[in-house]
Amino acid sequence: MCCSILHHRNPRREHEFPAVVTSPVTENHIFLGGAGERGLTINGTFIKFTCIGVYLEDKADKSLATKWEGKLEELLETLDFYRDIISGPFEKLIRRSKIKELSGPEYSRKVMENCVAHLKSVGTYGDAEVEAIQNLQKLSRMLIFHLVLLKKNRQSPDGILGLSSSKDISIPEKEDAIIENKAASSAVLETMIGEHAVSPDLKRCLAARLPALLNEGTFKIGN
């Protein structure tokens, strides 16, 4: 595997990412596009807190394959490649498992700061986005992170962000809450793999895996 998180020296089950899963909400087949570690800079020190796996609906191959056939080095430096993943008309699922304890309020504050910074930079931080980010922050605080082993965000093509959590490694069947704002939903994934990504490892893995997975005949659901 290309991602360091997929061949950790002391692997744990919660840090493993299946190649293909079924969305418990839509029942769509979704495949693992890439996985990596995410951290935050706190008081000048970068600390790893979570493992992230990004899953894409199987129809992503038609949306991405014909346009992105470049080499790893080219894709790594091409922001439009990641933006096409973020804005693509297909379901996305972000699965996160913890490496290090981090309180719900501290985690949500850092994530929201990154989301707001992106929304302001692209000029989409209006009243609706302010409300959506505030709601997202409140919901994140409710899901106190040190009590949760796995968290999941589901992003639908029409802009719905579904939030759920689990105390074991299973993917939750029901969502705890939803945020209906496309800009805010996209901003969550943007902070992970966009221009100022908090998970360079995840970006590298996406650039390495997706071209091979999306080549005609290479990726088939059920294989």
Curated annotation (Swiss-Prot):
GO BP annotations listed: flavonoid biosynthetic process
Keywords from the UniProt entry: Flavonoid biosynthesis, Isomerase
Leftover remarks: Part of the biosynthetic pathway for all classes of flavonoids, a large class of secondary plant metabolites, many of which are brightly colored.
Described purpose of this protein according to its UniProt entry: Catalyzes the intramolecular cyclization of bicyclic chalcones into tricyclic (S)-flavanones. Responsible for the isomerization of 4,2',4',6'-tetrahydroxychalcone (also termed chalcone) into naringenin.
Stated name of the protein: Chalcone--flavanone isomerase
Entry's family note: Belongs to the chalcone isomerase family.
Pathway listed: Secondary metabolite biosynthesis; flavonoid biosynthesis
Gene3D superfamilies listed in its UniProt record: 1.10.890.20, 3.50.70.10
A GO molecular-function annotation: chalcone isomerase activity
Keyword Zinc-finger recorded: no
Binding site for substrate: 50, 114, 191
Substrates-to-products reaction catalysed: a chalcone = a flavanone
Species whose genome carries this gene: Pisum sativum (Garden pea)
Annotated site residue numbers, Important for catalytic activity: 107
Class of the enzyme per the UniProt entry, highest EC level: isomerase
Upper classification of the organism: Eukaryota, Viridiplantae, Streptophyta, Embryophyta, Tracheophyta
EC number(s) per entry: 5.5.1.6
